[in-house]
A protein has these predicted regions:
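Core alpha-helical transmembrane segments of integral membrane proteins
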Residues: 31-32, 346-447, 466
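Short helix-perturbing small/polar motifs within transmembrane alpha-helices
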Residues: 73-82, 90-105, 120-126, 149, ...
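Transmembrane helix-loop junctions at the membrane interface of multipass transporters and ion channels
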Residues: 110-134, 469-486
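Long, hydrophobic alpha-helical segments that serve as membrane-spanning/inserting helices
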Residues: 1-15, 22, 26, 30, ...
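Hydrophobic faces of alpha-helical transmembrane segments in multi-pass integral membrane proteins
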Residues: 15-23, 27, 64, 68, ...
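C-terminal ends of transmembrane helices
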Residues: 45-57, 98-105, 399-407, 445-453
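Structural signature of hydrophobic alpha-helical transmembrane segments
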Residues: 27-42, 76-93, 134-140, 380, ...
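Generic detector of multi-pass transmembrane helix bundles and their immediately adjacent loops
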Residues: 430-571, 577-580
Length: 692
């Protein structure tokens, strides 16, 4: 029972965050320096935003960099304010100076908002204490945060990675159940496919997250991570065999009518899903897995395959489920390979600075957007006669996310949570509760807020707002008079952040659709080249298959985010959803062909070359259609006909059937894009016609 409690992801996270915040307050209370303890507890907020609690092979190096940036920004703000430099200029300069971190890596990019938050915290401290005291608070606060988190992760044995792997296995179980229930149900594809695509998107997102964590921990170089690395590679093999599709609904219908295949397939899928959920719990709660076999289920599938040798569905299900069963039985991947190389870009400082100084740099646009928003917030504070508008500035930074949709949702949750929290705090302040009870209540509220923050950010904001008001009350003894002002400041900050995301150099996801579609087609092309090569190696096939899945997932994510953006053309949306659906079918065929190529199911060299030429022509045709700014025509000459005409007529092998279907999907995608491209949204000048 205690394992399920202490290792539960939400409970473990809430305990860690609550202890790292509240232990300094408790020590300050015991030593008679409660105010210093409360100020010390502000530093973990900066560290959380900077991601300094991320398990990393350079954990303490990142900690030192973060602490130096926090203390340095605090010193700069205090010195410049002492010289009467306007606050908008100070914050704008810091934002533009620190924006280069986004060019180094995505993890370094989180140092920008965290350092700005540290600067804004300094506004409330400047003039109330010596100039060196905030520097010590940030330095020792960051050190405390790092040492505590290092000890916590050592104590719980890399719990974040276990949580990600557990989520991956659980999502694979849900995906397996949903996929094979659709195989035996007569469901309209237009309604059945979107939920399945969402599940597959979650699986690939979790795989990408696990890759990032593995590389950050250098898991392939550490003996204590080999078991988790093996579990991750097992998950990759399971995803490969679960995600393949036959795409022969008429054959499925024939087999279901002639046998009890529907019940047997569902039995196998449910058995696999149940075992995956058990393994997910075993990883999360640090248990050794028990022995597992599903010989009866596989035997029933093989019997159906023998009874209906002319129907490919039985052989398809028996073969893939037998591979899944082997992975689950042996608790090992199907074949040995190293971890796929990390594709995360990391630049040294000076090359990153060179890229940052380009007007095309997304990092520069993001830093400029933040600097303008902070300047407007500072000027708004001056207009409202607020010498230190730190609440407006913090609200702007807290609600600003990477995209329009995420920022809009965060603004709604932040505003609603802050409003409710201020009302509750305003009512409870009238009761004049003793300090000991107040601190105990703040501890409980903080724990409950961290328990729900991952899934219910708005409700968590209610608790955090209450604790913030009571912190002001304990520090200044006049928290009640801040309530109305803080509500107005929150609304102003949310409006500034929303306006900045819409009007200040926005990066619309609809503008990235073309790039992501290009990347997906390019990944498909490389995978087909590798599969049809004379001697494809198993590790290379596995790496390229995952790149195909990740490229399609990026396209699917950008389409989902673009659907929430303003000014989106509904006709274009429907057409692009259909385009992405056909792209997903190609991914499933590549998944299936990868397993065939690894088992040395090959074509003759001449036939492989003809199919490769056909596929490359079709892929290039789709890419050229995306590059063209003209309306296009759906009646273009099919340039795939010539290579296809040389393919012998007769029974096709399984690999040839997959290739033929890929060609059909590419032809349909070209037709769709010819129609859809005229209706694409124009958010700024993001597509330019190249005149020759």
């Amino acid at each position: 029972m205690w394992r399920r409690l202490i290792y539960h992801p939400e409970v473990n996270y809430a305990l860690r965050q609550t202890l790292v915040l509240c232990l300094p307050v408790a020590i300050g209370l015991l030593l008679g320096h409660l105010q210093q303890g409360l100020l010390f507890s502000l530093v973990p907020a900066c560290c959380n935003i900077a991601g300094l609690d991320t398990p990393h092979k350079r954990f303490f190096k990142r900690l030192i960099i973060g602490g130096c940036l926090f203390a340095g920004c605090s010193l700069v703000v205090q010195l410049l304010l002492a010289q009467a430099i306007p606050l908008p200029l100070i914050l704008s300069g810091l934002a533009l100076l620190l924006g280069v971190t986004a060019e180094i890596s995505s993890l370094h990019a989180r140092l920008l908002p965290a350092s700005l938050i540290a600067s804004i915290f300094t506004l409330s401290l400047a003039g109330n204490m010596p100039i060196w005291e905030p520097l010590l608070i940030y330095a020792f606060g960051t050190l405390w945060y790092g040492v505590f988190n290092w000890f916590w992760f050592w104590l719980w044995r890399e719990q974040p990675l276990r949580e990600s792997l557990s989520l991956l296995y659980r999502e694979l179980a849900n995906y397996c159940e949903a996929k094979y229930s659709l195989l035996t149900q007569h469901t309209d594809p237009s309604t059945a496919l979107p939920p399945l695509l969402i599940r597959q998107q979650k699986v690939v997102d979790l795989i990408t997250q696990c890759y990032q964590q593995m590389h950050m921990l250098a898991a392939n170089q550490r003996n204590d991570h080999k078991r988790l690395l093996r579990a991750f590679q097992m998950g990759l093999d399971l995803q490969e065999h679960i995600s393949v599709s036959l795409h022969q609904p008429e054959e499925v219908q024939k087999l279901v009518e002639r046998s009890h295949a529907e019940a047997v397939i569902r039995w196998n899928a449910q058995t696999v899903a149940a075992r995956l959920r058990v393994l997910a719990d075993d990883m999360l709660y640090h248990r050794f897995p028990q022995r597992f076999q599903m010989d009866k289920q596989i035997g029933a599938l093989e019997k159906i395959a023998r009874q209906h040798p002319d129907n490919p569905v039985g052989h398809f299900c028996a073969w893939h489920f037998s591979r899944i069963a082997r992975v689950l039985h042996t608790q090992r991947p199907l074949y040995a390979r190293d971890l796929m190389a990390d594709k995360e870009r990391r630049l040294p400082l000076f090359p990153a600075l060179k890229n940052y100084l380009s007007l095309k740099s997304p990092a520069l646009r993001n830093a400029a957007r933040i600097s303008v928003m902070l300047s407007i917030a500072s000027l708004m504070g001056n207009a409202l006669h607020l010498p230190k508008p730190y609440w407006i500035l913090m609200t702007v930074l807290f609600v600003t996310q990477n995209g329009y949709g995420a920022t809009r949702v965060r603004i709604i949750h932040r505003a609603a949570g802050t409003l409710a929290g201020l009302i509750i705090a305003g009512l409870t302040l009238h009761f004049h509760v003793p300090e000991s009870y107040t601190l105990s209540g703040m501890l409980l509220i903080t724990l409950l807020s961290y328990l729900i923050i991952r899934k219910h950010y708005g409700w968590a904001m209610v608790g955090f707002t209450v604790t913030a008001v009571y912190t002001l009350q304990l520090l200044t003894l006049n928290g009640e008079q801040f309530i109305i002002a803080r509500l107005i400041d929150t609304l102003i900050g949310c409006l500034i952040a929303f306006g900045g995301m819409v009007w200040l150099w926005p990066q619309w996801q609809s503008g990235l659709l073309k790039k992501n579609a290009h990347d997906a087609l390019e990944a498909d092309q490389q995978a087909i080249r590798l599969i049809l090569s004379p001697d494809p190696k198993a590790p290379a096939l596995a790496y390229q298959r995952m790149r195909v899945n990740q490229a399609h997932n990026a396209l699917y994510n950008s389409l989902n985010q673009a659907m929430q953006e303003p000014g989106f053309n509904t006709h274009y949306l429907e057409d692009m959803k259909l385009w992405v659906t056909h792209s997903q079918f190609i991914v499933e065929h590549i998944n299936a062909m990868t397993t065939l190529a690894r088992e040395h199911t090959m074509l003759t060299p001449d036939l492989a070359q003809r199919y490769l030429e056909s596929c490359e022509i079709a892929l290039q045709r789709c890419q050229q259609r995306l590059d063209s700014d003209g309306p296009g025509s759906t009646g273009d000459v099919n340039i795939m006909e010539s290579p296809e005409s040389e393919v012998p007529i007769g029974p096709l092998s399984t690999l040839e059937q997959h290739l033929q279907r890929i060609l059909g999907h590419l032809n349909t995608m070209h037709t769709i894009s010819s129609v859809a491209w005229r209706q694409r949204p124009h958010h700024g000048i993001w597509l330019r016609k190249i005149s020759r």
